[in-house]
């Protein structure tokens, strides 16, 4: 899989030099007055009704210039940590179907006061209706939103269709475009590149490297991690930033 992706990257690297875009993709990070945006001190997470914790004794700090990736085997609690952080910052349940009984059993999870978060969910099943209604609910400029989707190679013909008819890759592009256009202190992305084509991945990489927003993300693409990340948080062993 990785070999195929690397081959596609090599074949398409020249395209970024040759294609004249209407406008560069832009992200609009906000600058928080606090240096530390998130700090976990020896936290353990547990779901209500479960005898075993999701994970134990996790510590890390995320500052304004950090782009940290969560690492660990499937089921170790990466997405659960993102949900706990969102709830701690006052964002409630980020997507439908989440277990509301997740709680911090031990330790403390700090989020900076007034922290504004832009969240890209792993789940796309809640996307319904048309783009106009989606933009209205999210407070997004529809013209700018559609321009970003075009830059991510979503065909204009899709703009008039209901999003539940979109492919998984097209739905991901909707969430990424919304995430990009939402000004925030911290960008939380949960497996954003699932089903995303290589050319769009390269554009997203360049976007992050240009604007360097603070990020906490889960992503299995090692090349993407190494290109845009500043560190890692390993979950499953008394974790720390590396």
Q: Where on the chain are the PLM-derived regions?
A:
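ABC ATP-binding cassette signature C-motif
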Residues: 32-242
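Coupling and communication elements adjacent to P-loop NTPase active sites across diverse families
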Residues: 1-50, 63
């Amino acid at each position: 899989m990785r070999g195929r992706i690397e081959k596609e990257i090599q074949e398409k690297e020249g395209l970024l030099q040759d294609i004249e875009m209407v406008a560069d993709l832009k992200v609009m990070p906000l600058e928080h007055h606090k240096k530390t945006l998130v700090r976990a001190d020896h936290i353990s997470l547990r779901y209500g009704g479960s005898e075993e914790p999701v994970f134990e004794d996790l510590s890390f700090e995320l500052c304004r210039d950090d782009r940290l990736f969560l690492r660990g085997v499937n089921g170790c609690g990466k997405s659960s940590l993102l949900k706990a952080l969102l709830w701690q910052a006052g964002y409630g349940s980020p997507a439908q179907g989440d277990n509301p009984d997740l709680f911090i059993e031990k330790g403390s999870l700090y989020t900076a006061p007034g922290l504004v978060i832009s969240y890209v969910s792993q789940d796309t099943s809640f996307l319904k209706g048309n783009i106009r209604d989606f933009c209205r609910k999210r407070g997004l400029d529809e013209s700018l939103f559609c321009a970003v989707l075009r830059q991510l190679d979503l065909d204009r013909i899709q703009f008039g269709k209901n999003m539940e008819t979109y492919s998984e890759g097209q739905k991901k592009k909707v969430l990424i475009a919304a995430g990009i256009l939402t000004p925030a202190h911290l960008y939380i992305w949960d497996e954003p590149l699932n089903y995303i084509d290589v050319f769009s991945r390269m554009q997203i990489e360049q976007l992050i490297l240009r604007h360097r927003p603070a990020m906490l993300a889960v992503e299995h693409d090692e090349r993407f991690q190494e290109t845009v990340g500043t560190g890692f948080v390993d979950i499953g062993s008394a974790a720390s930033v590396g």
